[in-house]
Amino acid sequence: MAAVRGSPPEYKVRAVEEIKRMISSKPVVAIVSFRNVPAGQMQKIRREFRGKAEIKVVKNTLLERALDALGGDYLKLKDYLGDQIAIITADENPFRLFRMIEDTKVPSPLKPNQVSPVDVVVNEGPTPIPPGPLMAELQMAGLPVAIEKGKVVVKATTTVVKAGEVVRPEVARALERLDIKPIKIGLDVKAMLDSGVILTPETLAIDTEKVLEDFQRAYQMALNLAVNSAYVTEETAEILIMKAVMDARNLAINAGIFEKGVMEDILMKAHAEMLSLASLLPDEALDEELKSMLSGIAEAAAQATPSVEEREEEEKPEEEEEEEEKEEEAIEGLGALFG
């Protein structure tokens, strides 16, 4: 006789219903891996997410049943099941939620026989390890070490393990001695579903500072283009009015248009041009008033610029002081020599 499968246990039915409620109640759903995350860190993450997002550790089989029951775009998340997973649901922007999840990661040491996800480089320089038997542990890890000025130093920058390699126990122990924590442990986003669109870590991991700089640069370029093409907007109206006033003022002054707002500037410009022309004429062509004005300008210029003699006089006392100091040092040296 063929075996007849009975109804699933009640606790599994309730678990699937709870997962369905979580997923369908929020616009953003994330599947994350929590492999190697300590229980204490997981509790801290729950506390930090409280009021911002809901997190729940789930079994792959139960999550798959919930997704099948919901159907539609939720089925896209089935491609990211596997491993030790949890679901996070939130009203938050997916990029901001991704940043929140990434911020849960903390530096962690590599464990013996673990596959390293990164290249681990120990830089040249002093270490916190005192001379003694611990030096041998560093040498067993392949580090060129020596004692200099009472300290153990690494003589050359060394890659002790490459990405994809198994971490030897000697290397793990040496890195722990050096307090090197090359990896970060925390929740790893596998995928997010936002309004029917799947977002992967490659899409979500954006450099917010660079994006902000790009927006600022684009805004400045757009503002410059709008101002130079006289395109009136809320942002450019004030700048364009100020520019128009300046251009009109300059035109009126240079064209000699007698308007109340520029009369004083026109007279000042004409006066300056008159004095410039007068300075090119011989004295006999000038009246006493012009001669007086030109001489006043010359005297003011002379007072503003110190003469060569004055500069030399200012430098002499400094040179004399330096010579006196040298003589005093020489006398002191002779005194020390002859007791």
From Swiss-Prot:
GO molecular function annotations of the record: large ribosomal subunit rRNA binding; structural constituent of ribosome
Domain of life: Archaea
Keyword RNA-binding recorded: yes
Keywords, alphabetical: Ribonucleoprotein, Ribosomal protein, RNA-binding, rRNA-binding
GO biological process assignments: cytoplasmic translation; ribosomal large subunit assembly
UniProt biased composition (Acidic residues): 310-331
A Pfam entry, by short name: Ribosomal_L10
GO cellular component, as recorded: cytosolic large ribosomal subunit
Record keyword Cell inner membrane present: no
Residue ranges of the region described as Disordered: 300-339
Role noted for this protein: Forms part of the ribosomal stalk, playing a central role in the interaction of the ribosome with GTP-bound translation factors.
Homology family: Belongs to the universal ribosomal protein uL10 family.
Subunit structure: Part of the 50S ribosomal subunit. Forms part of the ribosomal stalk which helps the ribosome interact with GTP-bound translation factors. Forms a heptameric L10(L12)2(L12)2(L12)2 complex, where L10 forms an elongated spine to which the L12 dimers bind in a sequential fashion.
Name of protein: Large ribosomal subunit protein uL10
